[in-house]
Amino acid sequence: MSLIPYALTRPFLFGMDAEAAHELTMDMLARGQRTPLQWAWSGEQVSDPVQLAGLTFPNRVGMAAGLDKNARCIDALGAMGFGFVEVGTVTPRAQPGNPKPRMFRLPEANALINRLGFNNEGLDAFLHNVRQSNHHARPGMRPMLLGLNIGKNATTPIEDATRDYLLCLEGVYPHADYVTVNISSPNTQNLRALQSDAALDGLLGAIAERRESLARQPEKATGRPRRVPIFVKIAPDLAEEQVAVIASTLQRHGMDGVIATNTTISRDAVQGLRHAEETGGLSGAPVREASNRVIRQLRHALGKDFPIIGVGGILSAEDAVEKIRAGADVVQIYTGLIYRGPALVPQVAKALRAMPRPA
């Protein structure tokens, strides 16, 4: 159980610049994890196992990518009670991202806008941090799953994007429980073009081929080959016809799941609010319905068995239940953690555990 109520720390953090508060929090988590200080934010480990994409998720609540871009805080996040933690997005080479300021709170809407731009320390540093974590062996706790989210460098031309994704896939493959291919951030120029028909077909074809090659190679740790599931993260700003084409392409190339959705470029729900006109991706409550719409469309297009991770606008247990009813199998949170604190994690996990399971 967390020793420090978030209601006491949130005013201090919200009094700071949004990115400065983020960096301070990540530094604190990185320094305190695997020490007695970790109890300050530890949460109840809710057991609600679900089988998905050949994996056993300890519960149905995950940490979305983007919070821990450099995989510095894997164990700290796991201690909050997440059943799975996704870190990244990582790119082959380190890059600074977009100029600051680039993260803005919209508290009236329980929302954030960011245009960070895949700022990260690069693949080598990312893998070093992953190897330092002990997420597979947390004493007295159920092992969480670890997702590693990959992208392309901003300076890589879009026609060469596949090269970056394959470099990252090869690097993260031995360390991931699953890999996420991020083609939907609005903050890397032209990245969302990879969601178009021909571009997506080419990218996923190359990824599928490389994955099959990697899956035949014995792993150093076990001496046995392992097929790592691959998820693809898509945007909320898609027409139903685009969602249907993406769904077909995912299935054709043997992808194991889809994450719906990333942030939105729409400002319809926040017009008139301070910072609403800042460029970047909008997350939090205003993206909830768009995310749910895409999830419903995906479930219709993909059938009942294809894994869907729902993310976008979860600030309460009720929001998470709504995601599952829309068609998601499990959920992820990010902005909700910032506005509600770590207590949200077990609250959501318990609410989802209480839902009737399909027959």
UniProtKB/Swiss-Prot annotation:
Transmembrane stretches, start-end: none
Binding site for substrate: 69, 114-118, 182, 187, 262-263
Compartments in which it is found: Cell membrane
GO molecular function: dihydroorotate dehydrogenase (quinone) activity
Major localisation: membrane
Binding site for FMN: 65-69, 89, 149, 182, 233, 261, 284, 313, 334-335
Cofactor: FMN
Bilayer disposition of the protein: Peripheral membrane protein
Protein EC: 1.3.5.2
Key words of the record: Cell membrane, Flavoprotein, FMN, Membrane, Oxidoreductase, Pyrimidine biosynthesis
Top-level enzyme category: oxidoreductase
Pathway: Pyrimidine metabolism; UMP biosynthesis via de novo pathway; orotate from (S)-dihydroorotate (quinone route): step 1/1
Catalytic residues (positions): 185 (nucleophile)
UniProt entry tagged with the keyword Chaperone: no
Catalysed reaction, written as an equation: (S)-dihydroorotate + a quinone = orotate + a quinol
Binding note for cofactor: Binds 1 FMN per subunit.
GO cellular component, one term: cytoplasm
A GO biological process held by the record: 'de novo' UMP biosynthetic process
Subunit description: Monomer.
General function of this protein: Catalyzes the conversion of dihydroorotate to orotate with quinone as electron acceptor.
Assigned protein family: Belongs to the dihydroorotate dehydrogenase family. Type 2 subfamily.
HAMAP family cross-referenced by the UniProt entry: DHO_dh_type2
Annotated protein name in UniProt: Dihydroorotate dehydrogenase (quinone)
